[in-house]
């Protein structure tokens, strides 16, 4: 005989199983990640971030000791991709660094060093290397893509046949040259069924390799993916914060390169701290203005992926975009500067893309337009800077005070003020 309690228990079991099936369906592309990352019994649906963070912290030591907990591959052997692969391997994740060139892979495996991009920094013994894309990608939980923006779409097309449940995290900052697409847009175009995220922040690779305290942001609509990335990369020297504003985090990482070029140019003229502060804050204003127009949360730009990344990139001579700007400020042509740098400076293309979009859609971006004039129209940098300083009156923080982006309102105010001044002088003369 089955009692009422037994029936109730069966009902509860059925209900629980149904909820589990729904949760598993929602997160089917993340199979095994949370279990490998935390070994906790927490469900996947509507996870409590504080509870998961606590569970991850408790299990972090075990995660670091057991290399089978999370299986990762980083595509791209540049400075940042190498730094992230090294960090994951050091944390105990089963990590492979994929590099296209077979000879480079052999050299890295033999020397345990990326001599081209991170010379002098020994990589973790547990880090594996591969030039075979299929072998590197299959049977992994997360694919981190750290290739230049120009190669991002082609890389996704190359791995598409080998996708069988992996999640993708973009480490690439910038926009596609001809389409104005961000990396998340390209992922949705090429692999629409894949669970994905983007990572961005003030992350100079050499400082990370030196174990200097740093932090970044993982943005994804998938809470399990956010927690998995945090578990994989979090360490005593590297904190990973979470966000669900993919657009804002990604735009912060792309747009700040523009103002790093501006800051590098300004440094070439040996400007003072006032000028640097002005470039930094007015650059942030442009970033948030453009971001809101694109659907981002303006508050995101006050975080690590916004002002944090902007500050680091604008104040460090390690920044490729800063160095490009500095060379331009010293009289080099853009072609000569890029050739001397020998690496990709995403900001050069971003300036052109943002200038065109802002012009088309009426977004007020004076610093961007000025840089475009210098780089693509061969205008004198000093003359363009003086023109910027002579621009019309504006309020400081436009999310606090309403803006009229045209100068019509300003012109009317000035005309009224001039008329009033003439009347006052006339009255004084009559007296």
UniProtKB/Swiss-Prot annotation:
It comes from the Bacteria. Gene3D superfamilies: N-(1-d-carboxylethyl)-l-norvaline Dehydrogenase, domain 2 (1.10.1040.10), NAD(P)-binding Rossmann-like Domain (3.40.50.720). The gene is gpsA. InterPro entries: 6-PGluconate_DH-like_C_sf, 6PGD_dom2, G3P_DH_NAD-dep, G3P_DH_NAD-dep_C, G3P_DH_NAD-dep_N, NAD(P)-bd_dom_sf. Catalyzes the reduction of the glycolytic intermediate dihydroxyacetone phosphate (DHAP) to sn-glycerol 3-phosphate (G3P), the key precursor for phospholipid synthesis. It comes from Psychrobacter cryohalolentis (strain ATCC BAA-1226 / DSM 17306 / VKM B-2378 / K5). Coiled coil: none annotated. It holds the Pfam family NAD_Gly3P_dh_N. This is Glycerol-3-phosphate dehydrogenase [NAD(P)+]. Its EC number is 1.1.1.94. It catalyses: sn-glycerol 3-phosphate + NAD(+) = dihydroxyacetone phosphate + NADH + H(+); sn-glycerol 3-phosphate + NADP(+) = dihydroxyacetone phosphate + NADPH + H(+). Belongs to the NAD-dependent glycerol-3-phosphate dehydrogenase family. GO terms for biological process: carbohydrate metabolic process; glycerol-3-phosphate biosynthetic process; glycerol-3-phosphate catabolic process; glycerophospholipid biosynthetic process. The keyword Cytoplasm applies. Pathway: Membrane lipid metabolism; glycerophospholipid metabolism. GO terms for molecular function: glycerol-3-phosphate dehydrogenase [NAD(P)+] activity; NAD binding. GO terms for cellular component: cytosol. Its main location: cytoplasm.
